[in-house]
Design a protein with these regions (language model features):
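Terminal amphipathic alpha-helical/low-complexity segments used for targeting or macromolecular assembly
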Residues: 1-26
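Tandem repeat scaffolds
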Residues: 21-124
Length: 124
């Protein structure tokens, strides 16, 4: 099982690198990377395209209007993070379970495989 898991992880890492390379932002802050502790961080409106957010702690982070296109969210903790108006188009390894723990609104752009949770403000 360990060998199989290691092989799968290698493929996930390669996929992440290929996807994120297409969208890397030269303006992305250096403090944002794999495993970053960004609990309560003020990241509103930042260009985070192609960010490696694997295992990042984004609990209660302010990501309103942030550009998170093609970012890697595998294992990221986004509980109570504010994704209102954020663009997560093309993000990889972002799950419905993660989205369900975050906050957002009708202006949040999600990958097509995910749905806006019922608790988000949708201005219907």
């Amino acid at each position: 099982v360990h060998e199989h898991r290691a092989e799968i992880n290698e493929w996930l890492l390669k996929t992440s690198k290929l996807v994120r390379a297409q969208a890397r932002s030269p303006k992305r802050p250096k403090k944002i990377s794999r495993g970053s502790v960004l609990i309560g961080a003020k990241l509103k409106g930042l260009d985070l395209r192609g960010a490696n957010l694997r295992r990042a702690l984004l609990i209660a982070a302010d990501l309103r209007n942030a550009d998170l296109r093609m970012s890697d969210f595998i294992g990221a903790d986004v509980r109570e993070a504010d994704l209102s108006g954020a663009d997560l188009t093309g993000s990889i390894f972002l799950t419905q379970a993660q989205v369900n723990t975050a906050n957002g609104d009708a202006n949040t752009k999600l990958p097509p495989s995910l749905q806006i949770p019922a608790h988000w403000v949708t201005n219907r």
